[in-house]
């Protein structure tokens, strides 16, 4: 093995935000958490400009951190999604509120649905809201829920759904663990969901490493909402029930060490 070895890279000043997940994954991979790049790295926080050979490609991490980049890539590759547009300003965005159905103004660089809002003709935004603005059709459901599928080195796993308990008062339309939704593990994923997830991970550059996809059913088939992965801005939620929590680490373990053996 070359000098420098293998490690889970988690550097200052952002290491505190990823300490728990980095230590857990390091135990699963049987490698140390390191504060400087190793020869092979599973990267959580590293400052901009720090080069490291990373299991999850840096460009894929960048795509996963910005829903606008995903929207462009999904559209170009024909990944099935809800009707989505990037618009220059709020005046153009408000015109979507005049269309049939409801529309979402999605905050493009946050996780856990933070910042999302339903668009109206009276919508106001902070001056620092990132542009272009990301507009997406709101998929109406009798019971709000979002499905999820993970992928590691091209292998789909962990089919699940997030939904609110019946006793949750006034549930948020943004179905996320951060807004109080619970995970429920499911059985074999539908073929259409697997196909949509694989297409999304592939175009995002995550097919050979690790990522997850949020999905919704529609009359025309399964739709990909967004992809996520581990990186300096966020990490895939590990607060999931067993056996999924263990399976995430197992799947990453196998995919990571396969990458090490090939590079």
Predicted regions and their residues:
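Phosphate-binding site of ATP-dependent enzymes
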Residues: 116-204, 223
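Short secondary-structure junctions
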Residues: 78-80, 203-209
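Generic beta-strand structural signal
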Residues: 86, 151-152, 217
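Conserved N-proximal alpha/beta basic substrate-recognition cap immediately N-terminal to
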Residues: 2-95
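ATP-grasp fold ATP-binding core
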Residues: 74, 97-114, 131-142, 161, ...
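Active-site ExK catalytic segment of metal-dependent nucleases
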Residues: 70-71, 106, 226-230
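C-terminal active-site "lid" helix and adjoining low-complexity regulatory extension at the edge
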Residues: 206-208, 217-263
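Short, solvent-exposed loop/turn segments at secondary-structure junctions
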Residues: 62, 110-111, 140-141, 156, ...
């Amino acid at each position: 093995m070359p000098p420098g070895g293998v490690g889970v890279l988690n550097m200052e000043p952002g290491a505190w935000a990823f300490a728990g997940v980095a230590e857990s994954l390091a135990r699963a991979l049987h490698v140390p958490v390191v504060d400087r790049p190793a020869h092979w790295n599973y990267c959580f926080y590293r400052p901009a400009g720090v080069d490291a050979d990373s299991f999850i490609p840096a460009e894929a991490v960048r795509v996963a951190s910005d829903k606008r980049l995903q929207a462009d890539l999904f559209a170009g590759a024909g990944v099935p999604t809800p009707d989505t547009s990037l618009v220059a300003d709020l005046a153009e965005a408000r015109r979507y509120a005049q269309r049939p159905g409801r529309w979402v103004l999605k905050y493009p660089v946050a996780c856990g649905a933070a910042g999302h809002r339903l668009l109206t003709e009276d919508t106001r935004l902070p001056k620092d809201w990132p542009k272009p603005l990301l507009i997406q059709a709101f998929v109406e459901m009798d019971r709000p829920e979002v499905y999820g599928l993970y992928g590691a080195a091209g292998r789909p796993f962990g089919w699940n759904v997030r939904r609110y308990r019946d006793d949750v008062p006034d549930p948020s339309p943004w179905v996320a663990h951060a807004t109080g939704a619970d995970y429920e593990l499911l059985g074999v994923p539908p073929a259409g969901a697997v196909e949509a997830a694989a297409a999304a991970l592939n175009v995002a550059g995550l097919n050979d490493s690790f990522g997850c996809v949020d999905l919704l059913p529609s009359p025309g088939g399964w739709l990909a909402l967004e992809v996520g992965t581990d990186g300096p801005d966020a990490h895939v939620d590990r607060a999931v029930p067993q056996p999924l929590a263990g399976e995430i680490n197992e799947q990453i373990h196998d995919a990571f060490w396969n990458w090490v053996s090939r590079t």
